[in-house]
Regions:
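Start-transfer (signal-anchor) and selected internal transmembrane alpha helices
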Residues: 1-35
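Transmembrane-helix signature of polytopic, membrane-embedded enzymes
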Residues: 23, 28, 116-140
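Transmembrane catalytic cores of multi-pass membrane glycosyltransferases
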Residues: 58, 189-247
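Short hydrophobic/aromatic helix or loop-helix immediately within or flanking a transmembrane segment
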Residues: 72-99, 103, 107
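Transmembrane-helix motifs of polytopic, lipid-linked glycan transferases
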Residues: 103-123
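Short acidic/glycine- and proline-prone juxtamembrane loop motifs at membrane-interface regions
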Residues: 144-151
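Membrane-interface transmembrane helices that cradle and orient dolichyl/undecaprenyl
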Residues: 157-172, 203
């Protein structure tokens, strides 16, 4: 009836406002939750090493480094695949002091899991489900949240999910992501593995869709080669994983 139609039309804006309020409240709740998990040990086992490596980069003025710290490998080429992270650490500490790295950690952690929450909320169509699943994810990750470059992999992985879950791939976003990621942390390798799964046309399998996905994947693979060691950076995680003398 006309009366029912008018009633439904009046209720629609109210429902929309309610959903928007719930969305923002869950983001706020998520921020507080993720901040609380950031109250862990600040100094990672190699935090000082990364700060010193950043200082070395600034002092030498080159990203192609030589190992002058160790005894057995002194003078050898140094594959510092996390050079950009080291520069960020050293720059941050030089500007604001080492104590403020805790704020850097909170910024990266909150951003990482808010992006994950947003990606999951959008994909599931349920804001509360996105909040709960992101909360479970950070609870699992909590023992590993300290000041080390691996936090950038958490951030970039969440960004990758946000860009690709339920969306068409955009090369102008994915290529810069992998160029930056490969120079921040070796976890880019897992990002490329996840990229293959996210790009594969599971529901619309055809030569054309597979070809399109492959072209995007190849472009991101080439982008990841834009680092000081080129393809050597791809071999480093494999060498580290299968070398029985690695810690």
């Amino acid at each position: 009836t006309p009366w029912h139609k008018r009633t439904l039309m009046k209720m629609a804006p109210t429902r929309e406002a309610h959903d928007r309020l719930v969305f923002w409240l869950l983001l706020l709740a998520g921020s507080v939750l993720y901040l609380s998990f950031g109250y862990t040990e600040m100094a990672g086992s190699d935090m000082w090493w990364h700060i010193a490596a950043g200082r070395e980069l600034v002092q030498t003025g080159t990203i192609w480094m030589v190992d002058d710290w160790s005894y057995t490998e002194s003078g050898s080429d140094w594959l510092n695949h996390e050079w950009l992270s080291d520069l960020i650490y050293y720059g941050w500490v030089s500007l604001w002091g080492v104590e403020t790295l805790v704020y850097w950690k909170w910024l990266v952690v909150i951003s990482s899991f808010l992006l994950l929450q947003l990606a999951l909320s959008r994909t599931s169509g349920n804001d509360f489900a996105g909040f709960v699943c992101a909360g479970i994810a950070i609870a699992i990750a909590a023992p590993f949240i300290d000041v080390r470059p691996h936090l950038y992999t958490l951030l970039n992985f969440s960004l990758l999910l946000y860009l690709l879950l339920g969306r068409q791939p955009k090369l102008w976003l994915l290529i810069p992501l992998f160029v930056v990621w490969v120079n921040l942390h070796g976890g880019f390798f897992f990002g490329l593995m996840a990229l293959a799964i996210l790009l594969f046309p599971w529901r619309e399998l055809s030569f054309k869709t597979v070809q399109a996905a492959a072209l995007v994947g190849i472009a991101c693979l080439v982008a990841a080669m834009l680092n000081p060691s080129g393809f050597g950076t791809f071999l480093y995680p494999l060498k580290y994983a299968f070398d029985e003398t690695s810690p």
